[in-house]
From Swiss-Prot:
Belongs to the asfivirus MGF 110 family. It comes from African swine fever virus (isolate Pig/Kenya/KEN-50/1950). This is Protein MGF 110-12L. InterPro entries: ASFV_fam_110 (IPR004848). Plays a role in virus cell tropism, and may be required for efficient virus replication in macrophages. The chain crosses the membrane at residues 2-20, 121-141, 148-168. It is a multi-pass membrane protein. Pfam families: v110. The keyword S-adenosyl-L-methionine does not apply.
Amino acid sequence: MKVFLGLLLGFSIILILTYQSPTTQHPPKEELAYWCTYAKSCDFCWDCQNDTCINKVINESISITSIVNCRVTRDSQSCFYDISVKIPNHHSMECSYPRLYEHEMFMEKWRDEYWPIIIKQCCFYLVFSFAFAGCVAFAICKNLRLRTTIKLLILLSILVWLSQPILNN
């Protein structure tokens, strides 16, 4: 019985030590002071109205253009910021020895105008995935050689790659 209780206690300690909170864009209010101290531009730290944003922790106000989209998570030892929508940028630190995120020039500005871009990208990739599937189906129906099929797929890949700058505008 003592062995069983010892194993149960050890297992619960391991679970506590390896606990990881889920990634969230809305940390609890009691944790906002912690998260907003070390990455000040995260959107969950600010209450924005009429192009002016007020910090929820220290009541400081800034322009809306310097706010970025952030997600946060933590495990037993480290705290992790996932910053941006298009180009991933990460900041991790030990929760007990936090450090300020000072590379705000790499943080992408977040505004509601990104939603049309995200929707456009999703539609674009959906159309091109149908094009890839159609290319493979065409090659199978016409009984084309593998070399010809690969050339068609490479051509479609080049078109996708070349259209990226246009899509991101």
